[in-house]
From Swiss-Prot:
Pathway: Lipid metabolism; fatty acid biosynthesis. The active site is at Y157. Its EC number is 1.1.1.100. Belongs to the short-chain dehydrogenases/reductases (SDR) family. Substrate binds at S144. Catalyzes the NADPH-dependent reduction of beta-ketoacyl-ACP substrates to beta-hydroxyacyl-ACP products, the first reductive step in the elongation cycle of fatty acid biosynthesis. NADP(+) binds at G14, G15, S16, R17, D65, V66, N92, Y157, A158, A159, A160, K161, I190. GO terms for biological process: fatty acid elongation. This is 3-oxoacyl-[acyl-carrier-protein] reductase FabG. It comes from Chlamydia trachomatis serovar D (strain ATCC VR-885 / DSM 19411 / UW-3/Cx).
Length: 248
């Protein structure tokens, strides 16, 4: 079999839909053994079955709440028991709880920080030792243009996504000597369930700020992730790849 990720193993968090689903699909098409993680068992199993059918490869699903350190650690050990190594991890899971700061509850703040940023710590701290042992690995953390520019009503989301960038740059310096690369992707206005829920007026306002004049597709984020996961980016670490139609 030919492909950029043949015989590689990969975990994609939040892989049941949207960007994560597209990344998992492309990775599998390129020869990787892929496992998607999510918190909805029914949706996750269905997504894994669909991915397996579409790619002709066995894609598995694990029920994991990435905001729970013990669940993450346990599933990493399960994955290693089955596949022996973790070559690529894509931290894509995330939520939004939008509100102006003056109206934002502590719970709305904490839930977004814990899920979007705390999960990065949980997953990376669990996979880093086996990657160091293997002296190889690619960590891809999905940030956002909001983490670069900010967005009104999203102080929690912006803080988490900006934190992911800082985390990734710091970690890249810790583990670079072990041949482990850590990079971020900062998607812009992408066609996902999250953006589909926006009203037309808000969508049009967003599009005014996109020089390419259109919404991005999840598959375009997946192509960026494939590049960062493959040997084509073997001398790239600690970077933020903006895939945003020129918004940043």
């Amino acid at each position: 079999m030919s492909g950029l990720l043949v015989n590689k193993t990969a975990i994609v968090t939040g892989g049941s839909r949207g960007i994560g689903f597209s990344i998992a699909k492309l990775f599998a098409e390129q020869g990787a053994n892929v496992q998607i993680w999510g918190i909805n068992g029914e949706a996750g199993q269905a997504a894994a079955q669909t991915l397996s059918e579409q790619t002709g490869r066995q894609v598995s699903f694990a029920l994991v709440d990435v905001s729970k350190n013990d669940m993450v650690s346990a599933q990493v050990q399960n994955f290693l028991a089955e596949y022996n190594t973790i070559d690529v991890i894509v931290n894509n899971a995330g939520i939004t709880r939008d509100a102006l700061l003056m109206r934002m509850s502590e719970e709305e703040w904490s839930s977004v920080i814990n899920t979007n940023l705390g999960s990065i710590y949980n997953v990376c701290s669990a996979v880093i030792r086996p990657m160091i042992k293997a002296r190889s690995g690619a960590i891809i953390n999905i940030s956002s243009i909001v983490g670069l520019r900010g967005s009104p009503g999203q102080t929690n989301y912006a803080a988490a996504k900006a934190g992911i960038i800082g985390f990734s740059k710091a970690l890249s310096k810790e583990v670079g000597s072990k041949n482990i690369r850590v990079n971020c992707i900062a998607p812009g206005f992408i066609d996902t369930d999250m953006t589909k829920s926006l009203n037309d007026n808000l969508k049009n306002e967003w599009l005014k700020g996109v020089p390419l004049g259109r919404v991005g597709m999840p598959e375009e984020i997946a192509k960026a992730a494939l590049f960062l996961a493959s040997d084509g980016s073997s001398y790239i670490t600690g970077q933020v790849l903006s895939v945003d139609g020129g918004m940043a």
